[in-house]
Amino acid sequence: MSAFLAPETLEDPKNQTVVAGFNVTLNCTAKGSPMPSITWIKNNDPLAIQSNPRIKYIKTALDDKQIHSQLVIEDAKKEDKGKYHCVANNTVGEKASNPAFLSIEDLGETYAVYFFLT
């Protein structure tokens, strides 16, 4: 007979700064019994990956109680900056991770200037 355990986060996402146009990955690991599901939250709203093809979830079961989730943002843009956290949820309860802040640096366009000396 297995015991039921409320979710607990084992790995929280970390603060990151990424240059616009590059990919960024946020990680979250949780455990519980039954195994929790993980959802991602941005600025206190659930992320809807269906409306943004640049955002992907990768979920991996580590064993019968632990799950690892990656939130991958491809081609990061200014609008991706914000506060992110994950929420682990099962039939016993839910647990939110500590937040991580994602900053996007926009280096702008690069111009080459040539000087010709005569």
Question: What do the predicted segments below correspond to?
Answer:
Residues 1-118:
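Immunoglobulin-superfamily
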